[in-house]
């Protein structure tokens, strides 16, 4: 969400920088119904919405992102995969991606993500856990 649309104190409340209702309405509902859809992703780096992305119906739709596992969206998925790696690997990847912005990113976003994972038991509620560093998959439910 653009800053003007975020709730007060969003930096202390996991997932309040996301518009889950819009994600459901614009992406998840049409995808599950086998209909074409398009969406606008907000770029914090750019401070603006990116150009629209159009998607055609498909048998497999992958919704990626930390907050895509929010319990409010659980009924939209047939399979939930939690992708993880070690803290050292996370740091290495984020430093490569964020460059000079890494310290600010680590201070703001990592605690929010970790709080979200803990509050909603994201890893524990996944059907599969993929260790991206080791290339291993673990089924969490029978």
Describe the predicted segments one by one.
Residues 106-109:
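Acidic, metal/cofactor-coordinating or nucleic-acid-engaging core segments within structured domains
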Residues 1-54, 60-61:
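Conserved nucleotide-sensing/catalytic segment adjacent to the nucleotide-binding pocket
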Residues 46-97:
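ATP-dependent NMP and nucleoside kinases share a basic, alpha-helical "lid"
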Residues 20-24, 62-75, 134-142:
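Short, surface-exposed, charge-dense and proline/glycine-enriched linear segments
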Residues 8, 40, 71, 114-115:
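Flexible, active-site-adjacent loop/turn segments at secondary-structure boundaries
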Residues 75, 79, 88, 92, ...:
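NTP-dependent small-molecule kinase module
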């Amino acid at each position: 969400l653009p800053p003007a649309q975020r709730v007060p104190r969003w930096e202390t409340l996991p997932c309040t920088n996301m518009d889950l209702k819009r994600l459901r309405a614009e992406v998840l509902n049409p995808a599950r119904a086998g209909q074409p859809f398009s969406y606008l992703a907000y770029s914090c780096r750019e401070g603006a919405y990116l150009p629209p992305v159009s998607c055609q119906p498909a048998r497999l739709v992958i919704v990626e992102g930390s907050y895509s596992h929010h319990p409010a969206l659980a009924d939209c998925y047939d399979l939930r995969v939690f992708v993880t790696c070690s803290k050292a690997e996370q740091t290495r990847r984020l430093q490569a991606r964020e460059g000079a912005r890494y310290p600010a990113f680590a201070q703001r976003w990592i605690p929010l993500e970790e709080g979200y994972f803990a509050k909603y038991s994201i890893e524990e509620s996944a059907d599969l856990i993929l260790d991206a560093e080791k290339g291993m998959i673990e089924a969490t439910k029978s």
